[in-house]
Structure formats: structure tokens, C-alpha cells
Amino acid sequence: MRPTTAAASGMPTVCDPPWSSTVRREPARSAGVGFDVRRQSAESPTVAGSLRQDLRERMGSSGPLPFVDFMQAALYHPSDGYYATRVPGHGSHYRTSPSLTPWFGRLVAREFRRMWQAIGEPDPFWVVEVGAGQGDLAADAMEETDAMGVPLRWRFIERFDRVRDWQRRRLGPAAGSAEWLTDLAGPPVAGCVLANEVLDNFPVHVLEVAEAGRVQEIYVDVDGDSFVERLGALSDVTLAEPAREAAAHLAPGARFEISSGVEAWCRNASQALTRGYLLLIDYGGLEPDIWLEHPRGTVATYRREDATPSPLDEPGSKDITADVNFSAVARAAQSAGFRPEPVITQSSWLLSLGIARVAEELETAGFMAALEGLVEEATVLQDELGRLIQLGDAGGLGNLLVLRAAKDAPTPC
């Protein structure tokens, strides 16, 4: 069903989303996942009670919520949001690079060493990591930089106590070189602000191109026992300009997302540093391809290993993601005082850090172990090599994008 004329006056209208259902996380994350919201139960017993009630009360008192607010609550509700209740890594729906192999953290440690050297070898050099999950990257990178002689300290930005406890246990004795804050507002330091697969969980405004280039926003409402999608006017005037830019490339009916939190986040990241770098690794694309290649948008939902059809069904029980618009992020970083470099793939970035040499060494070690009849050792090395190769696989993790930006610092080399 096409939107009715009521949408033009700013009143939300029921719409029928034409989104498909294609998995786009690792190993294959190239297509968007749509959702059919016509019959999604708001009373399912698996939906967290407090979150469900909060959403229903907000919609009842203020009307339909922009999808961005629904996504914020579903992921980050303090008691029932997805990231408030999940144990990092337990029942995960995909493997991140740090959880796949310790070699990712070891290679990233080389990047930190280059940064540390480029800004004059400060003591300490801080890594400020947002959304560190289990803490695998920190544990592996801290061990490697310690062997390199880099005086590294780690600052975790984590709002949930249970995740902090998990990270402390993962680090073990190295936790003595780390600290935990709830946001980026701590004392500014020299080092690097790091976010690995974090920005794709930033809540997004979902917009749809209407006739004559008009753009409308997706809202979420409750209708009886169901959450439903509605179309309405833009909820924030600051969306108008970027929405017009995207709509100029798209046909009526196409959808796209805008993350309104990126600008403020980049400002906070800049304020967290006296000098140093911003390092972002995530699924995403550049304009205009990110719009043209995903005409139904990129919002996707997952429960454990499975893609699920709707983010409106059982909020809090599943992850919700949207591909990162790295063109918009680079602009936000520049406005915040960073000097962004060209965006590259994780595959290209890891090649610059020596992954090919590591692969050769593992392959040679495995071959020699096999020649000597050390079957178990050869098997372990072969498995380690296979996992290393996955980091740069162009059909999977290697296709993640990497953005590095400097603040009052030279380009590392």
C-alpha cells in the first residue's frame, strides 16, 4: 500500500514495507534485510516486560515513535535492551575479527605502535575503545604491545556492569593497565579512539523517498497487540538536507538510513584526545553506492546465528544493525577536528600491517611440522592459518571498511 495523502500533512500513515530478507552479516552481508510489520505481536511472552511496557506507554502518550527511538530502546534499554541482557560472545549471531583469531589483535597492535611512534612515543599511549565486547582485541593487543615495548594503556567505554566484569576477567592481570568509563567524557589523553563493529549499532532514522522527491520518515506505533510501521513527516529538521542528497539518487519507494548520532559521537571522540587518532572498522559503504546498492535500506536483525524478519518483533531479544555511511562519518570526523584518510577495506589495511608475511610464516611452520610427523601441531597451524586468511577474505570480514583520522598528529607510517 502506498502512503495516503495524510502523510503530506505530517500525520503518520500505515504503510506496507517492501523489504526483503537476506542475511548480510559475516560471511555474507551484502544485501539489506527488510521487515514486514503488519502482524508483529507486542504481547509476546519473550519480549522483555519493562521494555515492552515503556514502548507502549510512550506511543500511547506521544504517538508513534520515529524508528530511531524504537531502535535505541530495543538495543540500549537499561534493563531489557539487547545489549543490557546479552553476555558478550554467548550465542552470538556472527563472529567478529577479534573473536575469530588472536592474530587480529596482534596485527592491530602494529597499528598502535605506528601511531605511538608518529606522535613522539608518549608514555602512556592510550587506546580508548568503545563497545569492546568480550575484550578479545584489548587482551591480544595489550599482550603484543607489551612485547614490543609500547607503554600502552586501555580505556574501555562501557555502560553495562555485566560486560565490564566480563572484560576484566578476560584481561586477567592486564586489567591493571586498564580503566573503565561509561562514556567518552573522561580526561583527554594522547592515543587512539577505537570502535570495531560499533557504529552499525548506532540507532538510525529510516527514510523513504516519495513522489516528486519528497522524503518521509518511518515511525513505529502500537495497534492492538501488534507493533506497526507508519509513514510521517521528518522528525528532525536537520534530516532535511542529507535526505535531499540521498533522495536525488533514488527512485520513489527506495529507503535509506541516517544516523543522527554520528556528529555528536565524533565530537566526543575528538574531545577525548589531546592528540592522536580515530580508528573505525565496520560494515558499510560510501555515497552514493550505499544508497544505490541497497534500494530497500540496510536495516537487519539477528537472533543468535539467524537473520530474523522484523526489528519490531520482540524488541530487546535481537540485534538490530544498519550499514555505516562512511562518507557521512568522514564528514563528521572532519567537522570534529580530525583529518580523515581515504576509507579502505580491512583486507587492504591488514596487508599494510603485514598479514601476508604472517600467513607465509604459519604456512611454512605447518609444512615443516607435517614433514616431521607432528600431525597435531601441523593441524593446529593449518587451522590458525585458515582463521588468519578469513580476516582478509574479500567475501566476508576482509570487506569491512576502515577509516583512520588524525587529530594534531601526522599520518603513521
Regions found by a protein language model. Name each.
Residues 2-25, 29-30:
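Low-acidity, Ser/Thr- and Arg-rich intrinsically disordered low-complexity segments
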Residues 35-130, 134-189, 207, 348-351, ...:
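Rossmann-like AdoMet
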Residues 74, 193, 329:
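A residue-level signal for conserved active-site and pocket-lining positions in enzyme catalytic cores
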Residues 132, 161, 199, 285, ...:
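Short, glycine/acidic-enriched loop or turn micro-motifs at the edges of active sites
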Residues 164, 202-203, 288:
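Conserved protein kinase catalytic core
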Residues 194-242, 293-303:
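A mobile, often basic/glycine-rich helix-loop segment
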Residues 240-413:
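Long, Lys/Arg- and hydrophobic-enriched amphipathic alpha-helices
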